């Protein structure tokens, strides 16, 4: 029981989860989400009497997409690269997706009948993302924040990316976003700009290379463009590796055979 509450201000906060349909409206103009409070306004009632409502409180929400293109280091698009998306650096909390008409859509776990990352199984419709004949993987319905894109299988003949790619989606909203009034219109003005970055770490020919990229974005469509490059895997191993030792021994053996044959001919 609270004492001396008369005249005090009460602040209520709420959280909501977007359903799968949010993936259909990435970028501007965004969409309205509304909430209001129903309360008892009958002092003589224990909650079963007359009720009233607060005015609607409205927030403009946005979702985003990542347009991925898989290529080799000569800009040839690659089919058959497999990816999974995670919300943590250790790649334990997967962001599940399902196949849609225009790409891979983030799944609302409740509506899909699955469970979250608490030891249960993945949602019913969850799939692994695979680059098509055009090399594309379109990922739709993301919230702002940081994600890790992990390649789980490289195209045939190419090296698998050793580390996941860290992707950040960074929107900038108007300062008075929380003062939006339901039905006000001009929801697109709420999103001022959209930025996205990618940190890519690769290991090739014995050297580690790290790159921080500023991705091309379009706030109207709510998308960021990311090119993921695979290099051919059949390169001579670095000095000191077991594979090189085998090659050197084999090469020396071939030379010995060649010398023996030459001596026999003499």
Please report, for each region that a protein language model flagged, where it lies by residue.
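Solvent-exposed loop/turn and edge beta-strand elements of beta-rich ligand-binding domains
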Residues: 1-266
């Amino acid at each position: 029981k609270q004492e001396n509450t008369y005249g005090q201000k009460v602040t209520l906060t709420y959280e909501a989860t977007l359903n799968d349909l949010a993936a259909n409206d990435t970028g501007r103009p965004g969409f309205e989400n509304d909430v209001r409070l129903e309360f008892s306004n009958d002092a003589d009632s224990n909650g079963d009497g007359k009720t009233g409502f607060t005015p609607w409180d409205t927030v403009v929400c946005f979702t985003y997409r990542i347009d991925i293109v898989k290529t080799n280091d000569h800009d040839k698009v690659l089919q058959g690269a497999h990816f999974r998306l995670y919300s943590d650096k250790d790649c334990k909390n997967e962001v599940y997706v399902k196949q849609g008409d225009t790409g891979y859509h983030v799944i609302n776990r409740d509506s899909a009948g699955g469970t979250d990352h608490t030891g249960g199984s993945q949602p019913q419709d969850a799939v692994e993302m695979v680059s098509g004949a055009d090399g594309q993987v379109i990922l739709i319905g993301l919230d702002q924040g940081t994600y890790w894109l992990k390649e789980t299988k490289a195209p045939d003949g190419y090296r698998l990316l050793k580390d996941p790619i860290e992707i950040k989606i960074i929107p900038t909203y108007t300062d008075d976003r929380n003062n939006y009034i339901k039905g006000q219109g001009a929801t697109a003005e709420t999103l001022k700009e959209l930025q996205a970055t990618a940190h890519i770490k690769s290991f090739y020919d014995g050297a580690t290379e790290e790159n921080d990229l500023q991705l091309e974005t379009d706030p109207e469509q709510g998308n960021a463009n990311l090119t993921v490059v695979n290099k051919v895997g059949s390169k001579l191993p670095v000095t000191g590796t077991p594979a090189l030792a085998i090659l050197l021994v084999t090469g020396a053996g071939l030379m010995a055979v060649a010398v023996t044959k030459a001596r026999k001919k003499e």
